Amino acid sequence: VTGVQTCALPILVIIISFNLPFLMEEYGLSSGRAGILISLFFLAIMAPGFVLNKIVQVLGRRIYMVCLLMIACGMGIILLSRSEILIALGCILNGLSYGIIQPLIYDKTSDVAVPHKVTLALAFVMAMNYVAILLCPFIVDAFQNLFHSHSQTFAFWLNLMVALMGMFIVMKQEKLSL
């Protein structure tokens, strides 16, 4: 797990809490209901913790590939749907994926860190996580300006593409196939 992966993961999914109300407004849906959908997203982040060992056991080496595919599918559902129910499904898929991968990053960090520096290593991972969340709107805005886009869908398309690229990179590194 690299620093880039640690930073990229929260940016991929946190866009839901930043941009979903604006996207729903652009779709002609109630932006006020976005709070409920964002709550479902955060609830879904927590849920895998109850069965994480079983998920890891079932998915094995494919876990990162599957989670990145779920993020891409969730973003796609959010983008293509004008239904709050389906947007909720997209939010849940993203939350579940993040809820699976994030603990694995912390676990891997504690495994690879020198024993007397584990706390420091975990602190760095946590700091990178929050720096990524802090920088997310600026990064997305920079890409939006670069591509001259003014649509609220841009951030979701960008993250869908990054998730797919990440999935293919993982597949190549792990020598996996769909």
Predicted regions and their residues:
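Intracellular juxtamembrane helix-capping segments at the cytosolic ends
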Residues: I100-A113
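Short amphipathic helix-loop junctions that connect adjacent transmembrane helices
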Residues: F18-R33
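Helical-face signature of the major facilitator-like transporter fold
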Residues: P10, S83-G95
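A membrane-interface helix-boundary motif in multi-pass transporters
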Residues: V140-V162
